[in-house]
Each structure stands twice: as C-alpha cells, then as structure tokens.
C-alpha cells in the first residue's frame, strides 16, 4: 500500500511538458490493461534513471496484435511488454528469440533493435536473480516447482539454463496442461541436459523426496 501510494504521488507530480519530440516510447500490450500499475513503475524508473522515455498501456488482444506490432515497429517504439493474452501469439511475429524464450515458447518483453524485434521472457530470470540475491546457488541442485502456469514454466527453463542438475515439476494429472507440460519437460531435458521430470501432485512420496 505504501509503495502504491508513493508511485501515485509521483504520477501526480509528473510533468507532461517533459515529453518532447525526442521522447522514446515503450508500452504494455494486453487485454485488459487499464488496471495495470506498469506505467507507474516504469515511468518512475525512467525519471530516477534520467531516461527520456514514456511507458503507456495499449488494449490489444490476439486478433489485433499483428497490426499493433507492425504499427509500433513502424513508429520506432524502443520496446514493449506483453501480458495476457499475447505472450504466446507474439512469438510468431518476432525476428529473434532469446534462449529462454525459445524453450518456453512465450515472450513478455520485446526489444526493437534497429528494426529487428527480439523477444525475451524475464519471469524466470527475475526469480533466479532473487534466489541469487538471497545467497543461494542452484548449480548442481534439484529444483522443485509446483504448478504448470506460465511463470512456473519460465522458472523451470531458467533453472535448467542456469545449471540446475534436475527440475521436478508437480501438477494435477487431470490438468488440461498435463500433456503439454510433459512435452515441455522432455524438450527442456533434451535441449539443456538438465533432468526435467513431471510428477502427479498426488505422488506424495515423490514430492517428499524432491523437497
């Protein structure tokens, strides 16, 4: 609550006269996005870092995403973030994918590098940075992940890329994502050499041994 209050106060102090013809554009593309606090965080970060950029939200869905990306690219946008429902659809519209984005098949950050759109997935990286900041090294360790949502898959991929010996994913066998996650685990193992296995949540023995 304090953080939100601080950001809101900063937003109220924001001077629109600071925006000029040189100000770079960055954005969030998703639907819905009106509730997002991303503009508060990013615009305050730009201010503190002395960067001449502005961050806006655009309500864009999977159907309108291709036209939106083409238009933003033409206008020279420096980069943009993706939120639901666009993280998977954006992949086919990009020129290049980072290693983790290739493994996950989803992108939340796009950089416009002189007209070449490069996609990244920063969810796993952000999580692993927090782990490192807490003084932990996952190299050669087993990672246990509960759930098969987008953030979970990103953490699995980043764990494998960062040197984990194994990743154990626990999910409901009745989940509609079970088969997709099984293929993801097999592909991640083959591409990284990390042993990635999928277990049923009800396999309490496997869960206990993994933890």
Predicted regions and their residues:
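Short, Lys/Arg-enriched N-terminal segments with co-localized hydrophobic residues
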Residues: 1-15
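Phosphate/diphosphate ligand-binding glycine-rich loop within oxidoreductases
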Residues: 18-134
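Glycine-rich adenosine-cofactor-binding loop
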Residues: 30, 119-124, 140-161
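Active-site glycine-rich loop that binds ribose-phosphate moieties when present
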Residues: 126-131, 137, 150, 154-155, ...
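NAD(P)-binding Rossmann-fold cofactor-contacting core
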Residues: 164-188
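Short acidic low-complexity segments
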Residues: 192-211
């Amino acid at each position: 609550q304090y953080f939100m209050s601080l950001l809101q106060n900063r937003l109220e102090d924001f001077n629109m006269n600071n925006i000029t013809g040189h100000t770079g554009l960055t954005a969030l593309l998703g639907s819905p996005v009106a509730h997002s606090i991303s503009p508060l965080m990013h615009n305050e970060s730009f201010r503190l870092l002395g960067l001449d950029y502005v961050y806006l939200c655009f309500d864009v869905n999977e159907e309108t995403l291709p036209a939106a990306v083409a238009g933003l690219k033409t206008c020279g946008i420096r980069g943009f973030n993706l939120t639901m429902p666009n993280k998977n659809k954006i992949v086919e519209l990009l020129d290049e994918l980072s290693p983790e984005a290739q493994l996950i098949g989803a992108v939340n950050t796009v950089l416009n590098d002189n007209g070449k759109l490069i996609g990244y997935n920063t969810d796993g990286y952000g999580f692993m940075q927090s782990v490192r900041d807490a003084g932990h090294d996952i190299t050669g360790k087993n990672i246990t992940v509960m759930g098969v949502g987008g953030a979970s898959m990103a953490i699995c991929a980043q764990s494998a890329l960062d040197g984990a010996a194994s990743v154990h994913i626990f999910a409901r066998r009745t989940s509609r994502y079970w088969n997709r996650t099984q293929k993801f685990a097999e592909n991640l193992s083959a591409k990284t050499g990390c042993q990635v296995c999928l277990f049923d949540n009800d396999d309490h023995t496997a869960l206990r041994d993994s933890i």
